[in-house]
């Protein structure tokens, strides 16, 4: 079983990389938010618990997140790429317990600077119609301010301001530092300031050497 963990601050390119890398490796992608919504929609026992937590405004506990990860791993024997999970050392320890010594575990940390993150996210625009994400510097729409897919006017997220982005970046570094240390043995640190193509090329070279 191949298991890949993607860590990195908001704006480091995890989402885009997860899509490209999962297609290249032939593995499924686990995104915590998506898994929570799927559990709620399925109305499973786990989903009912998640729904109660979400509706009450409570953080979903580590045990529940790990149970979702375990279900996802069992459903995808071809391998799994975890995007933004684990978020705590407790979740990391739980994930390690789910992965056997024979499994192929890789942890990739996209190490991007505060300046790079701020530049990327202040340039980000989102389509409220179909959810497509653009970057006015690196991936602009064909028609200024309008989604290529559905012609909806693009918006800027309220939290994509420089002050909020810099604060989120510092919080992420504080929360992630223990994870980077925890996974020191498996960690592949990649320069997240590079373009998405170069980052993908570097990771593919490490995971799939010729």
Q: Which sequence ranges carry the predicted segments?
A:
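Glycine-rich phosphate-binding loop of ATP-dependent small-molecule kinases
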Residues: 1-210
């Amino acid at each position: 079983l191949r298991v890949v963990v993607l860590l990195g601050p908001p704006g480091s390119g995890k989402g885009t990389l997860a899509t490209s890398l999962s297609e290249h490796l032939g593995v499924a992608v686990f995104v915590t938010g998506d898994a929570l919504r799927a559990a709620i929609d399925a109305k499973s026992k786990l989903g009912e618990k998640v729904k109660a937590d979400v509706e009450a405004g409570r953080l979903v506990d580590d045990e529940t997140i790990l149970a979702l990860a375990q279900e996802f791993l069992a459903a995808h024997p071809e391998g799994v790429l975890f995007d933004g999970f684990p978020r705590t050392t407790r979740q990391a320890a739980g994930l390690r317990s789910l992965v056997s010594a024979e499994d192929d575990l890789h942890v990739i940390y996209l190490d991007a600077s505060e300046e790079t993150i701020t530049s990327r996210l202040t340039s980000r625009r989102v389509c409220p119609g179909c959810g497509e994400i653009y970057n006015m510097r690196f991936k602009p729409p064909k028609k200024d301010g309008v989604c290529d897919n559905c012609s909806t006017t693009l918006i800027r997220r309220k939290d994509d301001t420089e002050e909020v982005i810099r604060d989120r970046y510092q919080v992420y570094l504080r929360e992630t530092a223990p994870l980077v240390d925890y996974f020191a043995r498996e960690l592949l640190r990649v320069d997240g300031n590079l373009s998405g193509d170069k980052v993908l090329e570097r990771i593919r070279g490490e995971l799939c050497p010729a």
